[in-house]
Amino acid sequence: MQKSKTRSEILRRLSEGDPVFTRKEYSDVVTMFWDTVEACPDQLALVEGDRSLSYAQFGAAVAGLAARISQIVPPSGRVAICIPNSIEANVAIYAALSAGAEISTANAEYTPRELGALFEIAPPGLILAGKRNSNVAGEAADNAHAPLITVGEGGIAIEQLLDTQPARPEVKITGDSPCIIMFTGGSTGAPKGVQRNHRSEMSVIKAMHTAWPTRVQEEVWLNVAPISHVWGTHMGCFNPVYGHSALIIVPRFQPDLVAGMMEKHRVSVFSGGPAAIYQGLLAAPEADLSALWLCPGGGSVFSRQTLSRWEAKTGLPILEAFGMTEGGPLTAQPLDGTHQYGTTGLPLPGIEVAIAALDGSGKRLPANENGEILIRGERVIDRYMGLPPVAEDGWLPTGDIGFTTPDGFLAVVDRKKDMLI
């Protein structure tokens, strides 16, 4: 099987301590963003179809929209982002944060009723929507008694923001400032809010980089996950900026289109995700993927056939991982290729994994025995918004069933159907 020469060279640089993999320490997401804008203003930041923004333009658009947001929402107020994957979504996220607001992310495909359930948990002071879903979001906004702004065509256009060129907002933001609320359905299907301050969110961003280290100003990312999902928020918004990188934005996953974009833009980091995404690309027409070197995967079980076919096609392994909105990335396959089929890799630094008996006794199980997966670590929450603690002694029950191998790899095999958290 032909191995990727690109990947081999990059891993060599990583093993030799090349500073291109090093990141500056930040206590908040806003400082991270503006540092990137100042460090590489002429660098390509966002590409969507035939539209693109440099980091200087990205910053100008963010500053312009932040000024509008500040007229409606005070610092530490809450802004719901309900925009499909787009340049507008990325601008909206950083604009709200730069205005000092806490953001919540909502799936742009949701109905008014589904959005209403999220807004009951975390009532917004302002809702930002895209053109495609402005009517649905508008109905939800009326029900929540919150103002709505459409970002993009039919509302505040990016081009309009670029013309205003306002100064960067002067808002004091610290690691303790509220940052983001993401929603998870858990095993009950009822949404729950996962709330993080800036310091906690930066710990998730850094964990993503630990699992999948990338090169400063050398990568081109392509994300297919919804930006409202924890995977999409990081792979399609936060981590490309953390690496001063270009991001190719895909509104919807279409295998033929994505394969062509990966070739055209020389994509080096593909956010991937579930097995179905990789299977779709395997069925797409041949494309030149020689610039590609990093392919994370997760959210579903990968068959041996899918893993083998992808590696045969690209010379690259799919780096399976296990993560949750409640803790970010938790385990990941080693970059060096020492994978164990059927597992999601080893616990990342700062994360502990335990397996508990399914009888409710709390008894910890040895290797190779199925039980409920428990997680503990600095970025793992202990409670959901407005609900009592669910973690005991720091251990959060995941609702997933799995086992650990004797050398510490985690395998996820099922979902605990009757668990209420």
Where does each model-flagged region fall?
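Conserved AMP-binding/adenylation subdomain of ANL enzymes
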Residues: M202-V220, S228-V269, A284
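Conserved AMP-binding/adenylate-forming core of the ANL superfamily
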Residues: F21-E25, D42-V73, A80-S86, N90-Y94, ...
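Gly/Ser/Thr-rich phosphate-binding loop
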Residues: V267-G272, L282-Q340, E352
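Conserved pre-ATP/AMP-binding loop-to-beta segment of ANL
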Residues: P41, Q165-F183, A190, P213-V220
